[in-house]
């Protein structure tokens, strides 16, 4: 019952020659892949292996290896991503401290490592160990005083400038794709776009190195987003080792989805959150098999990172938090306020950052990327140094803000006035009045907040690797901690107020300012990225308990609603639009009442559709058509009169087939007839040898009728991953809709410039 | 540019009459819905609300309410599902203890609650409090001795029989759909099938009550699967309150997916695991919006359950576990062995259970469901009572097996010989030689294992609510604990062996038998259900730490591989096939080289396809066609000669339209011409008034060419949720492929009986 002779689905190109000519089935740079066709090709490959595996033991083993290669790739990705993340963490640690001083015993030790080896490791003296010397101590032998301060200040700025200059130069010279967070581009690539070199080996190497440099330089950026890019580069590298993945753009994207999960997993130490991030934010086609493998890759990466143990505390997570008191219903109000703040911050950041990036693209500003980086770094360093909360690295800052004030905490933020009558228990310290340190800290935090807000807008989008998870979280954490301290002091001084009376007696520990910082961080991150489930799960993995999930969720939901009210796009989608990538978002709902006939080409008044006929055009006709148009493919019809559709031929394959036939097949000349039918057409006796091209004809092109609502067409494009779709009415070919047409139509309907969609 | 006059997409039925006649757009029982059409209808509804909302403030508020209704439904589902789960837990607790005795102070207290209120609440005497009386004490005033034992034995059996009889009678009389776990049917319903009453209010009520009865009766079944059904009934109930969900079968299924997540969330106290379970196992169409809402519903449900606090320990999770020692690499070998065991158990269970269920369906056995339940209950009770590990409830058993032996543990399983020279630390007890109790326990556990394996096969599928999560986990936990104790004793007595030497010194706590039980439970559950990510995440939420995720994952992966080697179907898919539901599994890969032309109807030699012409058939012709065939719809073509496709008309809507026209429109008689075009056809002067039916015509039917590979067709059916698809060649209509045809073809290709697919 299987009609094998007629078997020539979209993936089968081999009913004529045994070996397809080279390059058939590949795509050009900046083009969109055809998911159905990739899937079909993979099934063909799989069928071949399965049928071969019955022939001999060797083939059977090969088929087993093929089946296992997916897991092997995941293992390798996990190992490499985890290792790179560990190395980056260690290097950043060392280089950040290098800005302040150097370790005498071994210059490659960071401040903390240097003082570990020192003998005086009592808790109080940990920060002052003789082996660690500030630059002023080393150079002019002064540790205090104005001149020492100025010297250290200068050294700080110099190192920052050096790191930033090195980073931007490396990116410019070796790997221009290494800049930015990479997530917008990865989203586009995963949706089926080709950007050659974006996930290449050079990008991997340069991004890893420059990431260390820029993070150490103290710029307001994080390593989390770029780590996703680095992990995807690893994924791309390993998938190129296995023909199953290297030769199939669809399968390769399954590996990349898993790699993205591994990237987030190592960035936060949150494997489940990483998988959900990949599912929710990054991936386009995410079958359940990939879910399982992503989970595996994310776990391997997390455990590799843990065995490297860069933080020296065998914790998996970036910010480990442990709170001792529950939260109370009345606290939901400040939590929701923080959510509103997060939403507003998200909106402000996206608008300002996009406006600034557009200006960079369109004005002369974009011509001096090195200068821009140097200037921003200099300003950042100059303003950051005097304030202790901006001088320290942003992850340390967040960590400090998240922390609950224990009894042994020496930080300025924990400078509360203790009741002398009270013995100090280790946990469960009651709310106390704030001391001088806390008030100073509040001022410094307020300044740090303004500084971070402004400088992050200008930093994200420069020609260096830059993530915005950490800066966003920092903004939220600062705001949250300030609100938290405010509520705490209010509750301490006014515990007879009706809102506090029920849950905040004197002597009780009722408000945890660290929790507010965490809630604020989640809200701000949510406002910028519009993540939902993955955000809450990542935060859940940080705290490790369901206890605090309700505050986090309340803030995340509020922040998303507030931000969505001002604009549906998250920062990544906004950057995708800014760059004009052909990305068909799964989350956008198309609700307009247009029909396929309104979108298809040719429009009314335009010249008719360029088609091929099945058996009446010469090679020259086709070559002229190819030269005169730049369409990616041509529908093939029975004849120009009947316009009944037979199939679809890709431009690239037509060109290759004709070139190949002219070189290899005898008797093919310019006026040879090209035919797509099974049998050659009846030709006059003296006509040249005709050229059969059935093998490059896609006999199952996708068609819709002209009355199909566009919402259905959009759905089909999204779910099946089409490149183009033909439009018919009562069996006659009317026109064609490409992915670009769909995107332009959607932009037009949303009152945006349709010409902003640049690629096909 | 919007061609509004011609706007008649699949969802728009209103281009002629303002109000569609009743019942248009609904589906018959045991039919499949058309997802694209449901989606399109929802978009129409949404558009209408959005455009109306600009008219007045009242309409704007209504549109806000509509937008919020999704969250309200989720909140209500979470609240009700959590409450029901809490009530079920409390009732089961009480009724399970009722089989053994009664509380004198208040008969509605369970054993534990009874002894809480008692004054003698020291730890050792907790089990013996005077207020709790065994039946023998109460009835004949004897607590020890053979006659007391026999009396208690009899009472145990009597109560079990009473509970089981009540349950099976209630199910038979009031709600036949309340039987089984419900998950296979819910999977089918979520994939787009209609089973009226399956999620009705009666089913909800009866399933809740009978679930308590059967779990208390001591049968080898669990409440976890049925809780998913109960939660889905809640979801169905609340979605019927909002027209957004009640009138759209597609939207309703989004709510049901979230409800399933809430069900698992309360079953295990694992909200994230619940969402992933819904995503991985149950749901079919799971957009990201639903993911977020499911998470919300799952959280609300979990917190509602926690505030009810049925276990009295304010723990959210069903089995809370805390281990004190890490695992070692060498232990991976027994863990993988447990995985193999789990896979073998899964295969054995599925094969035997399906064979037994098939026998029940086909022989006289199925005619006596009450007797069957009584007999199985009697046998279960008689065998279970003498063995303490089968007498206690299965969840208590699992809980005990998971537990690490602490210093204060009085259980038989923790009867180790202590070193008298050693002081007893609270945690971190070194490995010790097993005492007599442990050896007795091993024998009893072995017997319990055999008993559970056999009896579960016969229990699952009877006409009572029955889940198999708990029995499967029990089988695995018993096997795991036995292996764990074995490894522990081996390591204790032979710590000089090379495999133990590196990690198991004398006096160290190296093996945790409880962890083996947990790994075994995961492996067995994985073997039966073939869950992957959700299984690991549920287990992760039980232990609450990433520490033990690698052993769990190793066992889950092994178990899935071993079980898959013997057959790809999990127990739920196997039951779906057994019942012949039209379920198109997303996980099955279709790899055969067939084409659409091989599957479409009519086959070669069959009578031609029944079609309607656009303007030449009379009402009578159509009525005859409808009477003579039972197709769900008919393609409409220009004329029988050209066979050019215009659209598709649903049978149900044709019948309704003709009935309606005959009643309401004047001049419609049997030989009126029916036309589907915009303009009426030119008719002879004396012909009766024609009937315009364009509004029921779907102008955008889905078409594929006859050369389309079936793998693509299957993909399209899956991803777009089609009911049928028309097959064309060069614009001519050749045939039709329905979902049933696809399923039959897939069954045939897998060498199964294609007639087993029963519904359309």
Swiss-Prot record, chains A, B:
Motif (Selectivity filter part_3): 467-471
Membrane topology classification: Multi-pass membrane protein
Keywords, alphabetical: Antiport, ATP-binding, CBS domain, Chloride, Disease variant, Endoplasmic reticulum, Endosome, Intellectual disability, Ion transport, Lysosome, Membrane, Nucleotide-binding, Repeat, Transmembrane, Transmembrane helix, Transport
PANTHER family hit by this protein: CHLORIDE CHANNEL PROTEIN (PTHR45711), H(+)_CL(-) EXCHANGE TRANSPORTER 4 (PTHR45711:SF2)
Region (Required for localization in the endoplasmic reticulum): 14-63, 667-696
Family stated for the protein in its record: Belongs to the chloride channel (TC 2.A.49) family. ClC-4/CLCN4 subfamily.
Effect of residue 718 to W: In MRXSRC; marked reduction in outwardly-rectifying currents; does not affect its localization in endoplasmic reticulum membrane
This protein's record includes keyword Manganese: no
Annotated motif Selectivity filter part_1, positions: 180-184
Keyword Zinc in record: no
Transmembrane segments: 68-105, 151-174, 200-218, 224-243, 291-309, 333-358, 365-385, 442-462, 467-486, 548-566
Residue ranges, Cytoplasmic side: 1-67, 567-760
Tissue: Abundant in skeletal muscle and also detectable in brain and heart.
Gene Ontology CC entries for this record: ciliary base; early endosome; early endosome membrane; endoplasmic reticulum membrane; endosome membrane; Golgi apparatus; intracellular membrane-bounded organelle; late endosome membrane
Outcome when changing residue 78 to S: In MRXSRC; marked reduction in outwardly-rectifying currents
Positions of ATP binding: 610, 631-633, 738-741
Outcome, altering residue 544 to R: In MRXSRC; has normal localization to structures resembling endoplasmic reticulum membranes; almost abolishes the outwardly-rectifying currents
Binding-site positions, chloride: 181, 469, 572
Domain (CBS): residue spans on this chain: 600-666, 697-755
UniProt name for this protein: H(+)/Cl(-) exchange transporter 4
Ranges lying in the membrane without crossing it: 183-190, 255-267, 271-279, 514-528, 532-543, 544-547
Sites marked Mediates proton transfer from the protein to the inner aqueous phase: 281
